Amino acid sequence: MFEKGYVDENYIRVPKDRLFSFIVRVLTKLGVPEEDAKIVADNLVMADLRGVESHGVQRLKRYVDGIISGGVNLHPKIRVIREGPSYALIDGDEGLGQVVGYRSMKLAIKKAKDTGIGIVIARNSNHYGIAGYYALMAAEEGMIGISMTNSRPLVAPTGGIERILGTNPIALAAPTKDKPFLLDMATSVVPIGKLEVYRRKGKDIPEGWAINREGNITTKVEEVFNGGALLPLGGFGELLGGHKGYGLSLMVDILSGILSGGTWSKYVKNTSEKGSNVCHFFMVIDIEHFIPLEEFKEKISQMIEEIKSSRKHPEFERIWIHGEKGFLTMETRLKLGIPIYRKVLEELNEIAKRVGVEGL
């Protein structure tokens, strides 16, 4: 999504700091340590600032439900199981995914500074929000960051109709002379959160996103939630590359779930369930170990400019680079506030009443 400043009457703008404080207030009331609550809040607010409504504050209910049900450990003993100069295997002890992810990426950054490459894999975690959050942590340090996670089964493999794969996102961020390059994508056509947005708004989904329980392409969001499945990136069949999205999803499961000794998407559970066992993969490359950082920035910026200034199709206003829309949307929302859908705002105020804190 790219916001230029206009939102319709179904949205209420909330200042970033007010939304951040609200999330921290809710989580600390439930017993989450303040430092951890701030990490979760920062992740959710960044998603909303960047226009990723599917992974923003609308996710708070999922985390609250997970905490109340006992599916999330509020005081996890996040520990290193195995470690070497350039790698580590982490056990998240069923903690909040954002906290496990943040600490894992911090460790990967440290190892990359020391050795040139840092790889940290985490198991026994929970949903960690937007993958790009962690990749950007490395880019802000002048490094290349890669982040992946598996997730509960929501996607059918090419040729199948059963939910076996997760939406299994991949993110890569790299520094440039301007804002970082940021690729942040699900390996399904869309993440499940986008369907949740359509469901709240009572809208049909675009054709090609998902199938129903019989395996037929559907635009009815309830058919997807009632036994249907999302399609892998590339869509139905192999003609437009659905098998490639399917393969990318498997890659994420191999690197995060299987390599960590955890589990793969078919056996990952929802946040509200005990032992959801989400697994993450983080990799950091210290550019200075290969070429000077300024040379890297010069070359990547030149590449981006050459792409953006190339001949455009007449139906498009401009050629975008990955992450660019998010940074422009962030500038708008930092000035005007974050637009929150009215039904989501009502849900957030219900959460506030439920836990006994001041609402929005």
Swiss-Prot record:
EC number: 1.1.1.37
Superkingdom of the organism of origin: Archaea
The keyword NAD is assigned to this record: yes
UniProt-recorded name of the protein: Malate dehydrogenase
Xref: Gene3D superfamilies: 1.10.1530.10, Hypothetical oxidoreductase yiak, domain 2
Recorded GO CC terms: cytoplasm
Keyword annotations from UniProtKB, A to Z: Cytoplasm, NAD, Oxidoreductase, Tricarboxylic acid cycle
InterPro entries: Mal/L-sulf/L-lact_DH-like_ah, Mal/L-sulf/L-lact_DH-like_NADP, Mal/L-sulfo/L-lacto_DH-like_sf, Malate/L-lactate_DH-like
One Pfam family it belongs to: Ldh_2
Reactions this protein catalyses: (S)-malate + NAD(+) = oxaloacetate + NADH + H(+)
Family: Belongs to the LDH2/MDH2 oxidoreductase family.
Organism from which the protein derives: Pyrococcus horikoshii (strain ATCC 700860 / DSM 12428 / JCM 9974 / NBRC 100139 / OT-3)
GO molecular function annotations of the record: L-malate dehydrogenase (NAD+) activity
Subcellular location: Cytoplasm
Name of the gene this protein is made from: mdh
One biological process term in Gene Ontology: tricarboxylic acid cycle
Top EC class of this enzyme: oxidoreductase
Assembly, per entry: Homodimer.
